[in-house]
């Protein structure tokens, strides 16, 4: 789709506006609300800060809370501590590239200030590009421009908004993942595999995305059985499946090998500044060269699974404690959304789901009448991906992470609400396909918006209960996340 497409221009404009508003509000909340004293990773600042650095910290310091501090530390100092290896290198490398572009300002700003500016600029860029990529993907998969347009606008108001703005890897991951999905829908398998591999170097759940490549190849194999020799086709399929798995898992394997060389080889210690050594001693952080950690003798020697187990207590049902009830409540809306989406799709297409999306229906007639929108047959693999992430995250992870995990990994969390809005909201149900037709019912004396989300907000009183629930969820988490996360309050 061209950049001059009206709906794409509207998505771009709305995404940029939301990014600007996000940065302004986080600065405001960071200034007027005192920070909570959280027991979080807080390394000492090695370089003195000037007045400009203090200004940058006041305006953008809200982007450096919680896990963002790990990414900033890795970008500045590298992987010094063992627990730093819980955070993949893709985003820190992007930050380093951003600071290189800011090199002319390094006489004025400290390295940390340059990193904060890089976070603000790069994550704003990645979030905008992710919104455009999601719109493009929606048009390819849903075959319903209205739902694709609405879903992209909802992404701009994502409940995971603060994590798309702060020094987290979600924005870059969403951009790479949605772009990879779009390339695969266009039949560009190599480009898709490369983008999925890059995404796997940004976040660990990128490894799950190999399922899209595997499903696409299996679907191609099934459709070619009538014209190809089955044995020859099966050999070709197995080779392509293995290549896809190797391609997507390569960044993860290289990262694990790098950790192994740092902690499991004698004499791998590096010179470390005294304040960082003192921090390691005070907090019990393990450094390379201290002594060989237990994971070095495991088979395979994976530092990532060890860190998740020992440092973060990640494991099956480990988070199911009474004191974690508030975090389960935080994750309830996105859980309900994905479960509802799964139920809606499975009940609409039971045969499609039983055949794993490889054969759409028993009835040849209905094959010729594909469902547009969320109920499209192409949505099946995306729904399985979302359900798998929800199941694993809900059973094995810190459940409050589900909002940002699903919000940055799967389009289902935006396609399904868009489907509900189009299906249940009278204000949108009767509107034509083109977004520029969304012009009626706006307040007197005001120009009616093309933006369907803004249209619903302008006509809030007449919206259906389902619409109000969706908008309240998106807007509340969008704003509350900024208020709490930027001040070290528990929103992680």
UniProtKB/Swiss-Prot annotation:
InterPro entries per record? PIG-V/Gpi18 (IPR007315)
Q: Record keywords: Chaperone included?
A: no
Q: Is Repeat there in the keyword field? A: no
The top EC class, named as a word, is transferase
One GO cellular component term, please give it. Answer: endoplasmic reticulum membrane
Q: Where in the cell is it found?
A: Endoplasmic reticulum membrane
PTM comment for this protein? Not N-glycosylated.
Query: Which residue spans traverse the membrane?
Result: 14-34, 78-98, 114-134, 137-157, 162-182, 193-213, 235-255, 328-348, 379-399, 469-489
**One Pfam family cited in the UniProt record for this chain:** Mannosyl_trans2
Q: What is its EC number?
A: 2.4.1.-
- Pathway, per UniProt? Glycolipid biosynthesis; glycosylphosphatidylinositol-anchor biosynthesis
Q: Which residues lie on this side of the membrane: Cytoplasmic?
A: 1-13, 99-113, 158-161, 214-234, 349-378, 490-492
According to the UniProt entry, its GO molecular function terms are: alpha-1,6-mannosyltransferase activity; glycolipid mannosyltransferase activity; mannosyltransferase activity
Q: How does it sit in the membrane?
A: Multi-pass membrane protein
Q: Output the GO biological process annotations, alphabetical, semicolon-separated.
A: GPI anchor biosynthetic process
| Stated family | Belongs to the PIGV family.
Q: Its function? A: Alpha-1,6-mannosyltransferase that catalyzes the transfer of the second mannose, via an alpha-1,6 bond, from a dolichol-phosphate-mannose (Dol-P-Man) to the alpha-D-Man-(1->4)-alpha-D-GlcN-(1->6)-(1-radyl,2-acyl-sn-glycero-3-phospho)-2-acyl-inositol (also termed H2) intermediate to generate an alpha-D-Man-(1->6)-alpha-D-Man-(1->4)-alpha-D-GlcN-(1->6)-(1-radyl,2-acyl-sn-glycero-3-phospho)-2-acyl-inositol (also termed H3) and participates in the seventh step of the glycosylphosphatidylinositol-anchor biosynthesis.
Name by which UniProt lists this protein: GPI alpha-1,6-mannosyltransferase 2
Which lineage do the record's taxonomy fields give for this organism?
Answer: Eukaryota, Metazoa, Chordata, Craniata, Vertebrata
